[in-house]
Amino acid sequence: MSHVVVKNDPELDQQLANLDLNSEKQSGGASTASKGRYIPPHLRNREASKGFHDKDSSGWSCSKDKDAYSSFGSRDSRGKPGYFSERGSGSRGRFDDRGRSDYDGIGNRERPGFGRFERSGHSRWCDKSVEDDWSKPLPPSERLEQELFSGGNTGINFEKYDDIPVEATGSNCPPHIENFSDIDMGEIIMGNIELTRYTRPTPVQKHAIPIIKGKRDLMACAQTGSGKTAAFLLPILSQIYTDGPGEALKAVKENGRYGRRKQYPISLVLAPTRELAVQIYEEARKFSYRSRVRPCVVYGGADIGQQIRDLERGCHLLVATPGRLVDMMERGKIGLDFCKYLVLDEADRMLDMGFEPQIRRIVEQDTMPPKGVRHTMMFSATFPKEIQMLARDFLDEYIFLAVGRVGSTSENITQKVVWVEDLDKRSFLLDILGATGSDSLTLVFVETKKGADSLEDFLYHEGYACTSIHGDRSQRDREEALHQFRSGKSPILVATAVAARGLDISNVRHVINFDLPSDIEEYVHRIGRTGRVGNLGLATSFFNEKNMNITKDLLDLLVEAKQEVPSWLENMAYEHHYKGGSRGRSKSNRFSGGFGARDYRQSSGSSSSGFGASRGSSSRSGGGGYGNSRGFGGGGYGGFYNSDGYGGNYNSQGVDWWGN
């Protein structure tokens, strides 16, 4: 670098001293339109059209620069540190793209519109076309298409699904559809359905889509893994594309500009856990591809500042856990004034986790439109009395939809119950894993966090590639574990109940209840991680004296699903019922045709099938007593797993799905 001292030319000093800023003569031949402006010497003889002062009415030098600053997180990152330059670039980083771009994107919220405006670099809020016709698709993005739809949709057992009974109750129930093309959902939705390779709607989708498109409130109870998420996302997004943003977009613009504004989502989806919220969000991304709708997700356990920055880019469909949403509302970042669609997913789980005060605060004590004005949907695998009472408060003239038996398990899941003492569980687990193919995903449930860490460490030292998740793990660690499991790098996942609900992990072949849960509903949700969306699966449960409280309900569930019942379980249930009294029985009786099994509006009272009836309703073979019949039989476990052991469970006819 040169350090030569430059002395001012006396003639130049004299010129500057005599400079008159208000003189037209100083313009150096510039256009008279610049009267009164000081023109730097190096620009004085240029054409007016090339002058730096050629600004638009807003004062920005060009549309590119204007757009670059009109949206936080745009692709133009001039003047920012290197870390911030990745925000909004559409990369698949986990939370903040700092050295973690290998992750598959769960929890990633750093995409401004998911590539919709990435070529032009401007925000949807500055594009006047967004106010015109939201039903028209935006230009495609090959990169984004590959990112969203490369997962595929394989192994669907639709033939089996067609036999599942459906019951819909309520006034003027719309007719169901047989194909997606039977109802007009618009060009964007139909194109995205094709990209996801959905060929036919599942039973819950056949009935729920026309109900929601008809703007009716819905309480739907369907088997776990039956396609509930798409059942509400497809019609809701279709309706948003048809109706446009309405007053919500206007409210955002009036509230503030350039990122400092409250967002007014048109649709709100509440979910009990972070994992389920992220899964719904990822599905929403797929079905909002090439649209002007921007989904967002907020949940606890993650950086709230990062989530706020994501919200500030725009939010039309919000997926949230109740606690974090209340926090966002109290911070003034979210307003529900224009929320047209409310979805409560896994509603029973939210009540079990104690979220009812937050849910009522969100729905009843804030600015959300009342029932009858908004459209409300509740989805879950079980609907006990408490949930149906909540539906009475939140839903208006709703339709009750039961797909399969309420609170039931899928017949696509072969259930095996084996007697294993606590000291023998680890060795028995090794026998099972040894008989399982190395490429099969196996989910092992335990009751405690320490138990999860201990079992993971044991399996690791036995040479198995495994990982674990539980409530004490950080959000990043949990997402990394799920990524390793989904990708098959660690085909064994040890989990506590935090992963039991809502996790949509395709191709899970085997669920093992290393520790059985204390209530039968948790059992239903755990084994529902396999056999999803018509695929075949296997569930194995280790049973001993500690699990006596669910004996009766477990027996009823196995009988109902036409599963093999060990004779020792029958004997224990009989003894427990007649000798042990009711003190040890589980709190649930909904697998016997009680309140939760049907629409309470049509039930005159809670009825229950007697123990003797359920016990005598099926014939089962097997040796008596506890001694020689606690395993899978003479062939051993490996023989069952490697044989075509699923077939026998699908030949039954006339299943009494409704508990009559």
UniProtKB/Swiss-Prot annotation:
State the EC number(s): 3.6.4.13
So where does ATP get bound? 198-205, 222-229
Q: Which UniProt keywords apply?
A: Acetylation, ATP-binding, Cytoplasm, DNA-binding, Helicase, Hydrolase, Isopeptide bond, Methylation, Nucleotide-binding, Nucleus, Phosphoprotein, RNA-binding, Ubl conjugation
N6-acetyllysine: residues bearing it:
55
**What SMART domains does this protein's entry cite?**
DEXDc, HELICc
SUPFAM superfamilies the record matches: P-loop containing nucleoside triphosphate hydrolases (SSF52540)
- GO CC aspect terms: cytosol; membrane; nucleus; P granule
Instruction: Give the sites modified to Phosphotyrosine.
Output: 103
Its UniProt entry gives the catalysed reaction(s) as: ATP + H2O = ADP + phosphate + H(+)
Q: Where is this region: Disordered?
A: 1-121, 578-625
| Residues carrying Omega-N-methylarginine | 100, 109, 590, 615, 630
- Any keyword Cytoplasm? yes
List the ranges annotated as motif DEAD box: 345-348
Q: Does the keyword Nucleotide-binding apply?
A: yes
Bias category Polar residues: which stretches?
15-34
Tissue expression from the record = Widely expressed at the mRNA level, with highest levels in testis. Testis-specific (at protein level). Expressed predominantly in spermatogonia, but occasionally detected in some pre-leptotene/leptotene spermatocytes.
Q: Gene3D superfamilies, alphabetically?
A: P-loop containing nucleotide triphosphate hydrolases
Question: An example of a Gene Ontology BP annotation on this entry?
Answer: cell differentiation
- Residue stretches of biased makeup (Low complexity): 603-620
Q: Where is the composition biased (Basic and acidic residues)?
A: 1-10, 44-68, 93-121
Q: Which residues carry this modification: Phosphoserine?
A: 85, 89, 101, 129, 181, 454, 592, 603
Entry similarity comment = Belongs to the DEAD box helicase family. DDX3/DED1 subfamily.
The protein's job, in short, is:
Probable ATP-dependent RNA helicase. During immune response, may enhance IFNB1 expression via IRF3/IRF7 pathway.
What name appears for this protein in its UniProt entry? Answer: ATP-dependent RNA helicase DDX3Y
Q: Which organism is it from?
A: Homo sapiens (Human)
Its ancestry begins with: Eukaryota, Metazoa, Chordata, Craniata, Vertebrata
